[in-house]
């Protein structure tokens, strides 16, 4: 026996809300990196890419951390909601201010896109004539 299909609205919600999220956090101490990764994982998903860049003159003094991952937004959730929640989670875990920059990129097909190829397009492509 086959399993019943999920409601259509849920399928569309999942298919149409795929985003790449890139968060940059600066100035971090090296010991704070695991806390930021944990906050990112709790709010969004486990990062697929983690990049650390030392800033300032002395290595190990301060860092810029960039985390990148792709994931689905939940129903009725907006990218701004994720950015807000992630920023506050990082501040709460560190118990101090750090600059957080979040970039979201929509990865799905445009929900407003509609393509229709009729007689006019066929005639242009192949030089055909249609008579009614």
State each model region's role:
Residues 1-42:
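Short, extreme N-terminal segment that most often corresponds to the first beta-strand
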Residues 1-3, 44-46, 79-81:
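A short linear-motif detector with a strong N-terminal bias
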Residues 3-13, 50-58, 104-105, 113:
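Short amphipathic beta-strand and strand-loop transition segments with alternating hydrophobic
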Residues 14-27, 56-74:
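Short glycine-rich, basic-tinged beta-strand/loop micro-motifs
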Residues 31, 43-54, 58-64:
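Structured domain cores in non-transmembrane regions
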Residues 33-44, 110-119:
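Surface-exposed flexible segments
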Residues 40-51, 87-95:
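A common structural junction motif
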Residues 62-132:
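Charged interaction segments
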């Amino acid at each position: 026996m086959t399993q019943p299909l999920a409601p259509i609205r849920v399928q569309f919600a999942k298919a149409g809300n795929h985003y790449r999220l890139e968060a940059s956090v600066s100035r971090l101490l090296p010991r704070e990196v695991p806390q930021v990764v944990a906050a990112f994982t709790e709010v969004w998903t486990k990062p697929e890419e983690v990049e650390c860049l030392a800033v300032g003159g002395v290595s190990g003094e301060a860092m810029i951390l960039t985390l990148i991952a792709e994931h689905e937004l939940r129903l009725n959730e907006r990218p701004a909601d994720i950015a807000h929640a992630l920023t506050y989670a990082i501040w709460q875990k560190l118990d101090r201010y750090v600059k957080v920059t979040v970039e979201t990129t929509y990865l799905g097909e445009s929900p407003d896109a509609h393509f229709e190829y009729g007689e006019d397009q066929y005639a242009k492509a192949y030089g055909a004539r249609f008579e009614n």
